[in-house]
């Protein structure tokens, strides 16, 4: 009886606490809205680069290059960076996701045609198993039904596995859909019928706030002087003569592009040279899974970043106590150089010293050391993404192997007018994008952490890859201190070895 009475009193007490208004719970004080506790998580395969200041630009006696990269003290925020360049295996995950989503969309459309758009109870065979999961609207919530009816937003069925074995295709409709994604029979070579990779297209949204704010200011200044000021609309690819009002959509561009790497770069980059084996096998063969992906454009690299962000946040939404993560993106030019230096000031290379060989006579990066000699260390083309020793931030191949796309546009005088805090110059009209780090086909000058080079954003190359960064939210001084301590330990270890 006493236990029952105690439980009853506890229940009444709980109800009385829950019925209090917000002002009573806060006792009239400003306590803020209570949210979930945020704990930063290091993404898999990334390392923390603690923010700080450094002298950016040429620090040696390369006088001609001072016009291109004069010294300037800048500060960058903390961020995570991929320890290696994005590998073929990692990029294949992106390509396979795009392939599967495109195929599932085509199967769902065919299923809707076959079933006549009639609701299903789930007891369907063949292509009906791949119908949109909202085809049966009886179980849809109000929001999902509204989005389907008003915006035609459909959900694919990812629970049913795709069948790639031709002998196991469930029905003729499935067969016809799958056959549409392979190259035509008259283009088959060596009896191998491969995917028509031009079908694998990824659509994504990109926001360029700074560029549009600059355009808005140009318009405001021009209109104040009664001038006509055209603005470029990247979505419609045309100039608008009227003031557009700058809605939210003006800050968003919609891109759709093919994601499969251009494997022909191994042949087109080098005339009168036999590189067909690399063209045939480099991207898809397991032997090269851990090698850096090449043949991707600057826009394809950005599309990969968008997909990686979406994939991570899709998982985060399935967990109640998980917060959404900031975007994955290409590093700015300043972030790349800061990370490449590995905590060393005024160093020529990521490993510090002015030499490209260690004390045992071994090269410390994959590059072209002598005229006509690409393979003095048996590395003719690229090597594994984690080959050679990492720098002070545990980042591999920040010099050599493949050059890397960064977010910044190439402007010769960018260092003169860019900000000193998180500097970045990315002009939407300038298709020249910075590449950094040098590659397997470059001489050692391009391996220097301050050397700048560029390529057009739509031009894939057999010597250009990329790695991504991920913003660190907050200012965890403990984490930064621990990282700096680790860097000092590595420096001391290297000093003792020497």
Annotate each predicted stretch with a short phrase:
Residues 24-51:
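Post-signal peptide N-terminal segment of mature Sec-exported envelope proteins
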Residues 5-12:
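Sec-dependent N-terminal signal peptides
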Residues 21-27, 48-49, 55, 60, ...:
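Functional-site microenvironments in short loops/helix caps that host divalent-cation chemistry
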Residues 79, 86, 95-104, 308-318, ...:
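Short capping motifs at secondary-structure boundaries
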Residues 15-16:
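C-terminal motif of bacterial Sec signal peptides marking the signal peptidase cleavage site
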Residues 109-242:
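Non-catalytic, alpha-helical, charged scaffold/linker segments
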Residues 424-427, 453-460:
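Short proline/glycine-enriched turn/loop segments at secondary-structure junctions
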Residues 462-477:
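Short, structured beta-strand segments at or near domain termini in extracellular proteins/domains
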